[in-house]
A protein has these predicted regions:
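Aromatic sugar-binding surface patches on proteins
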Residues: 67-79
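A short, amphipathic beta-strand motif
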Residues: 32, 119-127
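Short, surface-exposed loop/turn segments at beta-strand-coil junctions that are enriched for proline
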Residues: 37, 79-86, 161
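Short, acidic Ser/Thr/Gly-rich low-complexity loop/linker segments typical of extracellular
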Residues: 61-62, 133-135, 143-157
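Short, ordered, surface-exposed loop/turn motifs in non-cytosolic proteins
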Residues: 42-45, 121, 129-143
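Beta-strand-rich domain onsets/edges
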Residues: 2-27, 107-120, 185-202
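A short, solvent-exposed loop/turn motif at the edges and junctions
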Residues: 98-101, 166-180, 192-196
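Short Pro-Gly-centered beta-turn/loop motif in secreted/extracellular proteins
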Residues: 155-164, 169-170
């Protein structure tokens, strides 16, 4: 029987830097870390990643240095085997800290897997009327997300398919456009400034 967790030493897992969509059949990386509520040194903690079938797809040990700007998030960059099928996936992350003060911890991670990219899409966003490039526009090309740079452009690599292209930025009307991607291409989007709400007139 495992030792009960000391309530003063509650451990938790954080997972970040997993690209989504993940390309099927390719190895990818993510970062995972373990922290104790009492700030314990968790260097050497085992962190393992399992897919929906319970198959281990990656793992490693937390390093000696906490993640920058944290006092006790001990982390590792892990290589993992990507799924072989497209769509949504839910994996589990399991961590075991050294010693008996901390119970084993489990968390989940959800992501999308996609076919390998085939074509490069350049997206140009300008403002209606002025023609000025619009920076920092959040773009979604199907499951792929990107944002425009200061020149109002962004690039994304996608497999050939029909995609809904959505653009959003505060102060502009949301824009949706359908595009059939069968080769390298450029998509130009024209965004309209959102009208300011009418102010009520008070006597």
């Amino acid at each position: 029987m495992s030792e009960p967790e000391d309530p003063a030493h509650h451990a938790s897992i954080a997972v970040w830097d997993l690209t989504s969509p993940v390309v099927i059949g390719r190895r990818t990386t993510l970062k995972a870390g373990l922290a104790c509520s009492s700030g314990c040194n968790l260097n050497g903690s085992r962190i393992e990643i399992y897919d929906e079938t319970g198959t281990r797809v990656g793992g490693g040990e937390a390093g000696a240095e906490p993640w920058p700007a944290t006092s006790a998030l001990y982390w590792a960059e892990l290589e993992v085997d990507a799924p072989e099928t497209e769509g949504e996936h839910a994996w589990s992350v399991r961590a075991a800290a050294p010693g008996t003060s901390h119970a084993n911890v489990t968390s989940g991670i959800r992501f999308i897997a996609s076919r390998p990219p085939e074509h490069r899409v350049r997206v140009e966003v300008i403002e209606q009327g002025s023609g000025v490039p619009v920076a920092d526009v959040e773009l979604r090309v199907g499951r792929f997300r990107v944002a425009t740079n200061d020149a109002g452009t962004a690039h994304v690599d996608v497999p050939g398919d029909a995609y809904e292209v959505c653009a959003w930025k505060l102060g502009y009307q949301m824009l949706s456009h359908t595009a059939d991607i069968a080769g390298d291409t450029t998509i130009q989007l024209v965004m309209s400034v959102e009208a300011a709400p009418e102010q009520p007139y008070w006597m």
